[in-house]
């Protein structure tokens, strides 16, 4: 990501960065409004996801995660910002007149050609089944169920690696470190998701984070005892427990939260780190 550092004496933007290489005007037929209700609340109005709320209004971009335009080459026309994800998206014009958005592969530029299908070249941005990919291929936007669309490795900078094939299954190493079995009939896109340096972006001020819909985070140790198990005490007091806990008293920092006896346990060869 080509970052531009603000040169201004104003404290709020002195260390802020912005990327000026992306287009931000989406196509009208590929967007639609989406009602964002709750802002972290459930149907009863109770907070179930903390630190969410506010934020700028967004239009949802329809992303083609299925890549079902078989054997029809497309050309990258624009690279655009998407407020609904940390990865960039690019507009593809296919040879039959179809126009779709896909996740921007790292290194792809305007004018590049991509294609999806079987027996297509192993090049950046092409989508093909795992059975046609050689071992060691880097990929993203991986399907778990054939025809359902990519569900794995879709965040900015995410990349998975094909490490083995046996029978009808392929073994993948995911960005989290998890080693998992996936059917070889599932589609995946070659390459890494773009916008790798998103974690190096400096917002510059608290208001910029509010625009993203992220509310302030308060430490439990500075709360009152009625609000958090870590709260209370005189002055700067410790948490008063052997181990840190969540606001509801459950163990924090290391406790496994995955549901036991899940149907996909047999497909996971090694848990994520």
UniProtKB/Swiss-Prot annotation:
Show the GO cellular component annotation of the record. Answer: chloroplast; mitochondrial large ribosomal subunit
Q: Which Gene3D superfamilies match?
A: 2.30.30.30, Nucleic acid-binding proteins, Ribosomal protein L2, domain 3
List where in the cell it is found.
Answer: Plastid, Chloroplast
Q: Print the keywords alphabetically.
A: Chloroplast, Plastid, Ribonucleoprotein, Ribosomal protein
**Disordered: annotated span:** 1-27, 225-273
Q: Classify the source by domain of life.
A: Eukaryota
Question: What PROSITE patterns does the entry give?
Answer: RIBOSOMAL_L2
Provide a Gene Ontology MF annotation, just one: structural constituent of ribosome
What assembly does the database describe for this protein?
A: Part of the 50S ribosomal subunit.
Q: What is this protein called?
A: Large ribosomal subunit protein uL2cz/uL2cy
